[in-house]
């Protein structure tokens, strides 16, 4: 080292020194007593490397080589012991991983150096004529390199240049086996002190003859995430503390008392909420005039003691959900765009109050709605109809069902104290949807009204010119106000376009001041642009919990109908060997975990803190605690070991000595994956060889596929065993952990349910063959609660026979038949709509074919005319040719005698000349 300090390294032959202001080197301060030339113009890729990290990976030129050490680019010192492969020669290109230590005399020291194989012929440093470096270039790391005499295009560059990053993710790094331990930190940096461990592991791997996984292309997978609450969704009441426990990011008002979850009795497990009917609600544009409904928005005798509000649900219908799910299942070989999640397709129509999205509804009016809301349930329904018509322009009076979804209670302080109750209804909006004929007539009427009329326009222009100035100012202020409102709506609501066109299918049109917000935008969006009220957020969470319970119960009934999986007992010798291998692997993992550096520990802590809000809200699965779930750990020891191996960022083996050790040493910040993302990559590679232990003849219903898709937030195509067990445990039917494990084992292989590879059919699975005590879990074994009602028991108010015109009518049976007929009607309407689209497409094709035929016919006529013209031109040319030929023959006949006459004259002249010449004398 002292020799290196005293020695002044000469630059590479052929280089030039330039004077100027010294700038900081790309890799930090230069080594002590060295005066390397510093690059002044850094490329875009070089600027990307200035991120302040302690290690860099780059390619450079060996500028000095001695007995025990060398120098790369006159800045990076390396010992010959860190060279992998053959020793580099002076002037050769090498791949270097350097570490920065400001405490040493030479700050930049190489950790690994590798000579690049198959290098093209470099310039010889002796002849100066081959040096073609530009005058403004200086040598340094990633600066000017010696020019190549031969630069064939078939040799790709080592690091492809991109506008945003210098290093591209290598395609040689794969996670194709669960027993391939990663040895890189959470940010993709290789640990300097563990290079020997890498080499020893690789040598053992190769010596043992263990085959490497098949080389597969890297997939940009979405992180695995599930829509799942960490609590049971059967609590009938939530107070202040319960809301804070469930939704930690929710701001609860100070006057809030409690909320009663009425949807538990309105939609029991046996009669869940149906998404079968499409109900489309669209907000009209600002240009359309709102119809005068005649309803009073705020009467004088309004009483805040009772308020009635409605949840106006906009849903595409069950057939559209099935279509998206089947597209996702059918596109396994050639994946296309990921369809929208059901939470993004389900939307609520909300009103606005001081630029805040609020529920549609208002306070109770005794004079307009009724006198006693407690005794007469129709009073608050009238309030909801009146307020909804005044705020949205939608008439809900023809809705046939009004379900109580929730009841909010607020305490008004002051003498005397008052209890304010807000009742939220969920009406069947699909019953007020216009039919196809009505919708077509409405669209035609709007198109006729929107057509410009020149006579009326001119008359309006004349009237505007004769109007007084006061009316002009009033119109201007009104237009400015409407423009400001429209601008605010565009800035706040991201779901609505600037001027939404009328939908192709029937829809209910609402007023412009309303807004459509999806459940995903309310519940999942962590940075909402919309100011949402407290009640809207709570109702959205409750609606998602209701869907979670219904879809989870659908999975539960499907699992009950599947045959049990027969598990053969393991042999004692193999079991003992497997236990010994597991103990050895655990010890190896613990030893590797102890060697993790402080930087990696801090980075892991940061990643864990960033994921903690998601885990608290139930968006990411939490690891089981060591104290409270010892039995669950004992049952799923193998599954937890695999998950820990997938989550550990320090257990990765690289495939090649030369390429893979440097290929992923510096990853882009955007490609640094979270714990869930790394886990999804590990599982995706293992899913390809997963044995399908389910009976191939087993066909699941489509609603089960929709249930799987609902819980799979990012369309990964699979669900974990632990998440499926939690889905069953949160239904409220009091299953034990062992029961949930046995049910989930019917569709799980290797701790993962790959639901995308299962078979599905439209035929629904009948639940008649399942006994009631099995359908409702262990509720019959538990002591009855205060209300003593099963969640699957339907309300008994309308049961029995009803006399009508001297006969008894079974109302329940009639309603069931009406539901079946309505379902068939909706299915046929969907098929008719699909056939109409296909017919329209065929019509368009036929029209395009006709246009093409006409174009081809016109072109053929034009070609025929051109052909006739060419034939006429050919005939004219033939006539001219014949005429010229005759003239040439005539000229020949005339010129032949002249030629003979001239020849005779020449001969006669020659004879005369010969006679006149004197004879020579002797």
Curated annotation (Swiss-Prot):
<feature type="region of interest" description="Disordered">
    <location>
        <begin position="446"/>
        <end position="508"/>
    </location>
</feature>
<feature type="modified residue" description="Phosphoserine">
    <location>
        <position position="680"/>
    </location>
</feature>
<keyword id="KW-0131">Cell cycle</keyword>
<feature type="modified residue" description="Omega-N-methylarginine">
    <location>
        <position position="180"/>
    </location>
</feature>
<keyword id="KW-0963">Cytoplasm</keyword>
<dbReference type="GO" id="GO:0008380">
    <property type="term" value="P:RNA splicing"/>
</dbReference>
<feature type="modified residue" description="Phosphotyrosine">
    <location>
        <position position="684"/>
    </location>
</feature>
<feature type="compositionally biased region" description="Polar residues">
    <location>
        <begin position="473"/>
        <end position="491"/>
    </location>
</feature>
<dbReference type="GO" id="GO:0005759">
    <property type="term" value="C:mitochondrial matrix"/>
</dbReference>
<keyword id="KW-0804">Transcription</keyword>
<dbReference type="InterPro" id="IPR025224">
    <property type="entry name" value="CCAR1/CCAR2"/>
</dbReference>
<feature type="region of interest" description="Disordered">
    <location>
        <begin position="1"/>
        <end position="39"/>
    </location>
</feature>
<dbReference type="GO" id="GO:0005654">
    <property type="term" value="C:nucleoplasm"/>
</dbReference>
<feature type="modified residue" description="Phosphoserine">
    <location>
        <position position="612"/>
    </location>
</feature>
<keyword id="KW-0879">Wnt signaling pathway</keyword>
<dbReference type="GO" id="GO:0009411">
    <property type="term" value="P:response to UV"/>
</dbReference>
<keyword id="KW-1017">Isopeptide bond</keyword>
<feature type="region of interest" description="Interaction with NR1D1">
    <location>
        <begin position="703"/>
        <end position="922"/>
    </location>
</feature>
<dbReference type="GO" id="GO:0006974">
    <property type="term" value="P:DNA damage response"/>
</dbReference>
<keyword id="KW-0206">Cytoskeleton</keyword>
<dbReference type="InterPro" id="IPR045354">
    <property type="entry name" value="BURAN"/>
</dbReference>
<keyword id="KW-0227">DNA damage</keyword>
<dbReference type="GO" id="GO:2000003">
    <property type="term" value="P:positive regulation of DNA damage checkpoint"/>
</dbReference>
<keyword id="KW-0678">Repressor</keyword>
<feature type="region of interest" description="Interaction with MCC">
    <location>
        <begin position="609"/>
        <end position="669"/>
    </location>
</feature>
<feature type="modified residue" description="Phosphoserine">
    <location>
        <position position="677"/>
    </location>
</feature>
<dbReference type="GO" id="GO:0005737">
    <property type="term" value="C:cytoplasm"/>
</dbReference>
<keyword id="KW-0832">Ubl conjugation</keyword>
<keyword id="KW-0508">mRNA splicing</keyword>
<dbReference type="GO" id="GO:0042752">
    <property type="term" value="P:regulation of circadian rhythm"/>
</dbReference>
<feature type="modified residue" description="Phosphoserine">
    <location>
        <position position="807"/>
    </location>
</feature>
<dbReference type="GO" id="GO:0004857">
    <property type="term" value="F:enzyme inhibitor activity"/>
</dbReference>
<dbReference type="GO" id="GO:0000993">
    <property type="term" value="F:RNA polymerase II complex binding"/>
</dbReference>
<feature type="modified residue" description="N6-acetyllysine; by KAT8">
    <location>
        <position position="215"/>
    </location>
</feature>
<dbReference type="GO" id="GO:0000785">
    <property type="term" value="C:chromatin"/>
</dbReference>
<dbReference type="GO" id="GO:0005819">
    <property type="term" value="C:spindle"/>
</dbReference>
<feature type="modified residue" description="Phosphoserine">
    <location>
        <position position="626"/>
    </location>
</feature>
<comment type="subunit">
    <text>Component of the DBIRD complex. Interacts with ZNF326/ZIRD; the interaction is direct. Interacts (via N-terminus) with SIRT1, which inhibits the deacetylation of substrates. Interacts (via N-terminus) with SUV39H1; this interaction abolishes the interaction with SIRT1. Component of a nuclear receptor-mediated transcription complex composed of at least ZNF335, CCAR2 and EMSY; the complex stimulates the transcription of nuclear receptor target genes such as SOX9 and HOXA1. Within the complex interacts with EMSY and interacts with ZNF335 (via C-terminus).</text>
</comment>
<dbReference type="GO" id="GO:0043653">
    <property type="term" value="P:mitochondrial fragmentation involved in apoptotic process"/>
</dbReference>
<dbReference type="GO" id="GO:0032784">
    <property type="term" value="P:regulation of DNA-templated transcription elongation"/>
</dbReference>
<dbReference type="GO" id="GO:0043086">
    <property type="term" value="P:negative regulation of catalytic activity"/>
</dbReference>
<feature type="cross-link" description="Glycyl lysine isopeptide (Lys-Gly) (interchain with G-Cter in SUMO2); alternate">
    <location>
        <position position="590"/>
    </location>
</feature>
């Amino acid at each position: 080292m002292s020799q290196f300090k005293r020695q002044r390294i000469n630059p590479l032959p052929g280089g030039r020194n330039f004077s100027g202001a010294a700038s900081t080197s790309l890799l930090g301060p230069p080594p002590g007593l060295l005066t390397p030339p510093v690059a002044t113009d850094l490329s875009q890729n070089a600027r990307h490397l200035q991120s302040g990290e302690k290690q860099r990976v780059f390619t450079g030129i060996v500028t000095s080589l001695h007995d025990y050490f060398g120098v790369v680019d006159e800045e990076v010192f390396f010992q010959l012991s860190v060279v992998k492969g053959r020793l580099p020669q002076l002037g050769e290109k090498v791949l270097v991983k350097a570490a920065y230590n400001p405490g040493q005399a030479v700050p930049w020291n190489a950790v690994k150096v590798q000579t690049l194989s198959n290098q093209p012929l470099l310039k010889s440093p002796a002849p100066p004529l081959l040096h073609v470096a530009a005058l403004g270039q200086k040598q340094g790391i990633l600066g000017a390199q010696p020019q190549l005499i031969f630069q064939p295009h078939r040799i790709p560059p080592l690091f492809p240049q991109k506008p945003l990053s210098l290093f591209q993710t290598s395609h040689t790094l794969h996670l194709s086996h669960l027993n391939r331990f990663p040895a890189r930190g959470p940010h993709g940096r290789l640990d300097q002190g563990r290079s020997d461990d890498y080499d020893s592991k690789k040598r053992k791997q190769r010596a043992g003859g263990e085959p490497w996984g098949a080389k597969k292309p890297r997939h940009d997978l979405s992180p695995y995430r599930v829509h799942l609450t960490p609590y049971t969704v059967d609590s009938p009441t939530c107070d202040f503390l319960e809301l804070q426990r469930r939704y930690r990011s929710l701001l609860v008002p100070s006057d809030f008392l409690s909320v009663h979850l009425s949807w538990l009795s309105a939609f029991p497990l046996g009669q869940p909420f149906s998404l079968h009917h499409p109900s489309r609600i669209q907000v009209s544009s600002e240009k359309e005039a709102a119809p005068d409904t005649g309803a009073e928005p705020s009467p004088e005798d309004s009483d805040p003691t009772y308020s009635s509000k409605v949840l106006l649900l906009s849903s595409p219908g069950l057939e559209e959900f099935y279509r998206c799910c089947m597209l996702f299942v059918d596109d396994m070989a050639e994946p296309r765009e990921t369809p929208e999640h059901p939470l993004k397709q389900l939307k609520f129509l909300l009103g606005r109050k001081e630029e805040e999205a609020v529920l549609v509804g208002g306070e109770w009016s005794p004079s307009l709605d009724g006198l006693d809301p407690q005794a007469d349930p129709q009073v608050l329904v009238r309030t909801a109809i009146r307020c909804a018509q005044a705020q949205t322009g939608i008439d809900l009076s023809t809705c046939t069902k009004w379900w109580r979804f929730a009841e909010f209670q607020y305490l008004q302080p002051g003498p005397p104290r008052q209890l304010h109750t807000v009742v939220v209804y969920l009406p069947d909006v699909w019953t007020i949807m216009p039919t196809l004929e009505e919708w077509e007539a409405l669209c035609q009427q709007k198109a006729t009204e929107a057509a410009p009329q020149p006579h009326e326009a001119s008359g309006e222009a004349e009237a505007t010119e004769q109007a007084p100035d006061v009316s002009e100012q009033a119109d201007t202020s009104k237009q400015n106000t409407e423009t400001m409102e429209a601008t605010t709506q565009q800035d706040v609501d991201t779901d609505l376009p600037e001027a939404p066109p009328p939908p192709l299918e029937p829809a209910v049109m609402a007023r412009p001041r309303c807004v459509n917000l999806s459940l995903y935008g309310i519940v999942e969006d962590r940075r909402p642009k919309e100011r949402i009220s407290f009640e809207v957020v709570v109702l959205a969470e409750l609606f998602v919990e209701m869907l979670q319970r219904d879809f989870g119960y659908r999975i539960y009934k499907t699992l009950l109908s599947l045959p049990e999986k027969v598990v053969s007992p393991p042999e004692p010798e193999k079991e003992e060997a497997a236990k010994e291998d597991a103990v050895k692997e655990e010890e190896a993992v613990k030893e590797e975990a102890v060697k993790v550096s402080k930087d990696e520990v801090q980075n892991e802590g940061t990643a864990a803190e960033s994921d903690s809000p998601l885990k608290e809200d139930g968006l990411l699965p939490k690891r089981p605690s060591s104290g409270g779930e010892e039995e669950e750990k004992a049952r799923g020891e193998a599954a937890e070991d695999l998950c820990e191996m997938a989550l550990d960022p320090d257990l990765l083996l690289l495939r090649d000595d030369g390429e893979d050790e440097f290929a992923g040493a510096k990853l882009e910040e955007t490609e640094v994956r979270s714990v869930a993302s790394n886990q999804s990559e590990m599982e995706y590679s293992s899913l390809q060889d997963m044995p399908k232990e389910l009976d191939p003849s087993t066909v699941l219903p489509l609603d089960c596929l929709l249930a799987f898709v609902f819980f799979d937030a990012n369309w990964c195509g699979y669900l974990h065993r632990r998440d499926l067990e939690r889905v069953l445990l949160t239904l409220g039917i009091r299953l034990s952990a062992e029961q949930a494990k046995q049910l989930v084992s019917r569709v799980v292989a290797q701790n993962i349910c790959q639901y995308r590879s299962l078979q599905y059919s439209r035929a629904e699975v009948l639940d008649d063959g399942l006994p009631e005590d099995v359908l409702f879990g262990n509720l019959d074994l538990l002591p009855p609660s205060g209300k003593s009602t099963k969640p699957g028991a339907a309300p008994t108010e309308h049961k029995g026979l009803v006399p009508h015109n001297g006969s008894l009518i079974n109302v329940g049976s009639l309603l069931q038949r009406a539901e079946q007929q309505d379902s068939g009607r909706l299915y046929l309407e969907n098929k008719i709509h699909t056939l109409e689209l296909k017919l329209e497409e065929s019509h368009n094709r036929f029209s395009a074919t006709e246009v093409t035929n006409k174009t081809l016919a016109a072109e053929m006529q034009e070609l025929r005319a051109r052909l006739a013209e060419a034939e006429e031109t050919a005939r004219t040319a033939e006539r001219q040719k014949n005429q010229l030929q005759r003239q040439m023959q005539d000229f020949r006949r005339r010129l032949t005698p002249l030629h003979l006459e001239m020849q005779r004259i020449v001969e006669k002249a020659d004879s005369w000349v010969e006679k006149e010449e004197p004879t020579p004398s002797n």
